[in-house]
Regions:
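Residue-identity detector for glycine
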Residues: 8-11, 20-24
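General beta-strand structural signal in soluble alpha/beta enzymes
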Residues: 41-42, 62-67, 98-101, 125-129, ...
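N-terminal phosphate/diphosphate-binding loop that engages ATP/GTP or pyrophosphate donors
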Residues: 55-102
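Walker A (P-loop) phosphate-binding motif
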Residues: 27-58
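Short, low-complexity intrinsically disordered segments enriched in A/P/G/S/L with frequent Arg
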Residues: 13-15
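Conserved catalytic-core segment of NTP-binding enzymes
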Residues: 106-121, 130-230, 242-244
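Short, basic, glycine/proline-bearing loop/turn elements
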Residues: 36-41, 94-105, 129, 180-182
Length: 244
């Protein structure tokens, strides 16, 4: 397992499209150009919801798990094991399972089996590889995110609700955000500053702007165009899962 993997080293070609705006019947998994193997989801508000949406949409077998901490998913079987044959049997029965190691406060930590082993059992292993203290935006410390070695795609989630708010209220690790973007702790998070933070860290292959419908098209455009100019693919959407 490794920390802070810079993008561009996955061995997978980046999609040619630079910006996708959610609409019609295009699934999130299609917009993200999901590929089989390990996908790491990092960033802020909406990571766990994105994991669930992808599990619902993808047609193959799926393991939802974490390299940090995550709560179990309601309605999705939880498997705690170091036996890969149990994993295969569970996937054959349920198609989608959650895996991890029980920890404090009902949370799960990383599973007992290596992610590379899980990837040999399931079509997709989707790993929540970050935490954000439930804030809409985040800057990463040197030990973050915790991206598995064999990750083929890294998706960064950003919540549009953080735009227009003071840095110290909207950003997890605001001091790092300020250092990388030139923002001030009492200053306002603009779409351009949020994008500049992502560019400076250079951790993701693709960026998801969650709750895009809560901001004006012009604000969303400023965010996406700044990222587009640096070669990032951006999906603008509002993440909602269909299962209760």
């Amino acid at each position: 397992m490794r920390h802070s993997r810079k993008r561009g080293h996955s061995g997978v070609s980046r999609p040619a499209v630079n910006m996708v705006v959610s609409g019609g019947f295009m699934k999130i998994c299609e917009q993200l150009h999901m590929i089989k193997g390990v996908t790491a989801v990092i960033g802020s508000g909406g990571k766990t919801t994105l994991l669930r949406i992808l599990a619902e949409e993808l047609s193959g077998t799926v393991i939802l798990t974490t390299s940090t901490h995550i709560l179990p998913f309601a309605g999705i079987p939880l498997l705690v094991t170091d036996d890969i044959e149990q994993v295969r049997r569970a996937l054959a029965l349920h198609r989608v399972i959650c895996m991890g190691t029980p920890a404090a406060e009902g949370k799960l930590t990383a599973p007992a089996l290596p992610f590379s082993v899980l990837a040999n059992a399931a079509d997709y292993v989707i790993v929540e590889a970050d935490g954000s203290k439930r804030l809409p935006l985040k800057a990463h410390a040197s030990h973050e995110p915790v991206i598995p070695e064999n990750t083929r795609k890294t998706v960064c989630v950003v919540c549009a609700s953080g735009f227009g708010k003071p840095v110290k209220q909207a950003v997890h690790r605001p001091e790092l955000f300020c250092a990388r973007t030139g923002a001030h702790m009492s200053g306002i998070v603009t779409p351009k500053l949020a994008a500049q933070g992502i560019i400076a860290e250079n951790l993701a292959d693709i960026v998801v702007l969650n709750q895009a419908e809560t901001v004006s098209p012009e604000i969303a455009k400023r965010f996406t165009e700044t990222l587009k100019s640096s070669g990032f693919t951006v999906v603008c959407t509002t993440l909602n899962h269909t299962l209760e």
